[in-house]
A protein has these predicted regions:
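Active-site-proximal N-terminal segment of extracellular/periplasmic enzymes that hydrolyze or transfer
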Residues: 112-120
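Intrinsically disordered, low-complexity polar regions and short flexible loop motifs
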Residues: 107
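C-terminal cap/loop subdomain of S1 sulfatases and analogous C-terminal strand-loop tails that border
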Residues: 1-4, 10, 15-18, 22-100, ...
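Bilobed periplasmic-binding protein-like "clamshell/Venus-flytrap" ligand-binding domains
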Residues: 132-143
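C-terminal structured subdomain/cap of oxidoreductase catalytic cores
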Residues: 104, 119-122
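Short, charged, surface-exposed hinge/linker loops at domain edges
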Residues: 141-151
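Short amphipathic alpha-helical coiled-coil/interface segments
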Residues: 125-129, 133
Length: 151
């Protein structure tokens, strides 16, 4: 068991919850069934690790109006995808192909966009993101929604 107060820096996603619950319950999936997440049991028990892997988020739709009180006033109004690998996170917006690159260890608040100052990391993560979208057949909008404009 992990000691109280232990902090883990292992990046996880909600896709890891189901494989974790299956693992805890001792349920083995049929061969050929694939889950996107990984069991967190090795991390939770302190008896193993989860290999570093890219984590993906894909939001191909227009959803809600802007909130001027937030850091990103048009968050969830524009379609895009993002990938996190290690300390790095890349966001790509589909409307204008804007890219944002953040080093989360140095900038957890995502204030300093480093896509211009770190082109090699931008290229690396963009290639990973584009490959994932192709492999998963992720939908990408091809037309702008004129009802959603930057405030």
């Amino acid at each position: 068991m992990i000691k109280a107060g232990t902090i883990s820096e292992v990046p996880v996603t909600n896709l890891d919850f189901f494989p974790t619950l299956l693992d805890v319950a001792g349920i083995v999936l049929d061969p050929g069934k694939v889950l996107d997440g990984k069991s967190l049991v090795p991390v939770l028990t302190g008896k193993g690790v989860i290999a570093e892997r890219p984590l993906f988020w894909h939001f191909p739709v227009y959803l809600e109006g802007g909130n001027m009180e937030t850091q990103d006033s048009i968050f969830r109004t524009r379609p895009g995808s993002s990938v996190r690998l290690g300390d790095w996170k890349l966001i790509q917006y589909f409307e204008n192909n804007d890219l944002e690159l953040y080093n989360l260890r140095e900038d957890i608040g995502e204030k300093v966009n480093r896509f211009r100052s770190d082109p090699a990391k931008t290229t690396e993560l963009l290639a990973i993101l584009e490959k994932w979208r192709r492999e998963t057949n992720a939908p990408v909008p091809v037309a702008l929604n004129p009802s959603f404009a930057k405030p």
